[in-house]
From Swiss-Prot:
Catalyzes the transfer of a ribosyl phosphate group from 5-phosphoribose 1-diphosphate to orotate, leading to the formation of orotidine monophosphate (OMP). Its EC number is 2.4.2.10. Pathway: Pyrimidine metabolism; UMP biosynthesis via de novo pathway; UMP from orotate: step 1/2. GO terms for molecular function: magnesium ion binding; orotate phosphoribosyltransferase activity. It is an enzyme of class 2 (transferase). SUPFAM superfamilies: PRTase-like (SSF53271). This is Orotate phosphoribosyltransferase. Its cofactor is Mg(2+). 5-phospho-alpha-D-ribose 1-diphosphate binds at E117, D118, I119, V120, T121, T122, G123, L124, S125. CDD domains: PRTases_typeI.
């Protein structure tokens, strides 16, 4: 699957939105990628995650385990793991707390794991997920996502490979361009923020 194929999947699912959006990072953007429109379709999800699995194999080789941040990363993590023939686990947190492995999940010694995200904007969730894995006996070889909307600038503290890399401008609330400021903001994402 090429980056253009992935974007066509988003368009066909009605998941590539234009307007004024407050992202889960708190930044504002004229473009929102409504990934749940993709993940609500099992066939489409399998297709895009098989594409990501191919990119992971090319970059990192064989992996035994896919680790994703809850909640948004669970579906793409699971489906990517399935395409890789790997196990899928996830990190989760108490509200306001750090991510941690629970439910008996671990990265055993001798295993190779990759952290899989859906969409990376600032890389905050990815960095927090990777931090939760630092003390595990197995090796975390890197990270992967369907779309890196930072244009490759997000620093995760680990290698990142994306099925598509886009350079979509994002703005702090006090630095909006006039055309974006003229449109009422909506918050379609998942992380609680205060509009501003």
């Amino acid at each position: 699957m090429t980056p253009d194929d992935l974007l066509e999947e988003f368009r066909a699912a009605g998941a590539l939105l234009e307007g004024h959006f407050i992202l889960s990072s708190g930044l504002h953007s004229a473009v929102f990628l409504q990934k749940m429109a993709i993940f609500s379709d099992p066939v489409r999800t399998a297709r895009v995650c098989a594409g990501l699995a191919s990119v992971i194999r090319d970059r990192y080789g064989a992996v035994d385990l896919v680790v994703s941040p809850a909640i948004g990363g669970i579906v793409p993590g699971y489906e990517t793991a399935r395409a890789l023939g790997a196990r899928a686990i996830f990190v989760e947190r108490d509200p306001g707390g750090p991510f941690q492995l629970r439910r008996g999940f671990s990265i055993p010694a001798g295993s190779r794991a990759v952290m899989v995200e859906d969409i990376v904007t600032t890389g905050l969730s990815s960095r927090e997920c990777l931090a939760a894995l630092r003390d595990q006996p197995g090796e975390v070889v890197g990270a992967a996502c369907l779309i890196d909307r930072s244009g490759g600038r997000a620093d995760l503290g680990a290698p990142l490979v994306a099925l598509a890399t886009l350079d979509i401008p994002n703005y702090p609330a006090d630095q909006l361009p006039p055309d974006l400021a003229a449109i009422p903001a909506v918050k379609p994402g998942s992380r609680a923020t205060t509009p501003g």
